[in-house]
């Protein structure tokens, strides 16, 4: 367990104008004043705050960082904090982010200090306009300071979990009422038994790793999705609503087939096909690690899918379409006999019903556990597409996502009337590792990225996820596929 010392105050927005702060409350920079701290642990920091609540001899000093969204990440564990008020009295605060617990032990006089400060401010503020209790939030802070502390901490936690780690603190609150409160603090942490000391320095908070950092990271890793490009963390709960785009660099991360269907197909119009079709073990593939059937079963439990592709009929901006979406999370999106059969049946249905066709590709290629049966799916799908495109003159759009490799690239992935790729998608026939091991040559960086291949003419469009649905809708209407409800 870690022990932390910090001087703290509960600070409302309106105090900024009365106390003459040199910087706004939305800033993470230091706040200057002339008073000196009496705490030997933080005396050298020399970042102070002006008198608070009209008291020139205020001992609230060395107030440096906003304890809000940016700094909550340093306290993601159950820890006890020792808090010193302006009178030099110390109090124990228990902080449990997981269970939303914030308790002050022996905190009566500490809360009284807060109430006194708020009372002083309230009198000076309301005396000028002749009102004492017009503000409904005044009573909230006056008579239930413990509640306001809990509210503030819970708000900090919730806002942090809905943002990336290095988000600017000025977007934490946008309301104009008085309920927004901040805790400004100067933190000097001391890990029990180790002698490692941490402190704030300027506008950057430096925290050295403690012995339980790894455990804390593992404990909360299920809350985050790490970007493959910038390694930033994205809150998983809101990640889906952001189309799996990194909030920090905009990188397109992998999406599940269900999320893609939800992105492209109008709500309530999705009608799946061949959901009960599952893989057997046609060649009785032998594996010392895990039998093929057991591996398929494990992926079915993990993903909730029966195979690496979902096919069905739906509406895209009210335009009826046939769509197949591959899922890389199911055995790397590998194309086996079931995947090939489901896509072939989808194409045949679209041919019969004269529907436009979309196939979202995300695959590592043919499934080796099914041998030549998986390879023949390339020819089978291509044959069905020939009838769909050449004989029926219908419109097919493949969408190449990361990664699209192997047999999918060599067959239906590159047979579209208009081929669309996502930004930064990895598209290749043979992967980088296979090429380098086979030819003993280094593959140039970025030579298998969508932007480079677009310059070489391998596909027609690079479309981000945000406008993808509207782009497809315009393409379909250009090819005489119109919405059902159009007059």
Swiss-Prot record:
Binding-site list for Zn(2+): 227, 230, 246, 249
ZnF C4-type: positions: 227-249
Species of provenance: Panax ginseng (Korean ginseng)
Superkingdom to which the source organism belongs: Eukaryota
Task performed by this protein: Component of the acetyl coenzyme A carboxylase (ACC) complex. Biotin carboxylase (BC) catalyzes the carboxylation of biotin on its carrier protein (BCCP) and then the CO(2) group is transferred by the transcarboxylase to acetyl-CoA to form malonyl-CoA.
GO BP, one annotated term: malonyl-CoA biosynthetic process
UniProt cofactor(s): Zn(2+)
Co-factor binding details: Binds 1 zinc ion per subunit.
Involved pathway(s): Lipid metabolism; malonyl-CoA biosynthesis; malonyl-CoA from acetyl-CoA: step 1/1
Keyword Nucleus: no
EC numbers, comma separated: 2.1.3.15
Record protein name field: Acetyl-coenzyme A carboxylase carboxyl transferase subunit beta, chloroplastic
Keywords per UniProt: ATP-binding, Chloroplast, Fatty acid biosynthesis, Fatty acid metabolism, Lipid biosynthesis, Lipid metabolism, Metal-binding, Nucleotide-binding, Plastid, Transferase, Zinc, Zinc-finger
UniProt family annotation: Belongs to the AccD/PCCB family.
Location within or outside the cell: Plastid, Chloroplast stroma
Any one of the GO CC terms: chloroplast stroma
GO terms, molecular function: acetyl-CoA carboxylase activity; ATP binding; carboxyl- or carbamoyltransferase activity; zinc ion binding
Classification of source organism: Eukaryota, Viridiplantae, Streptophyta, Embryophyta, Tracheophyta
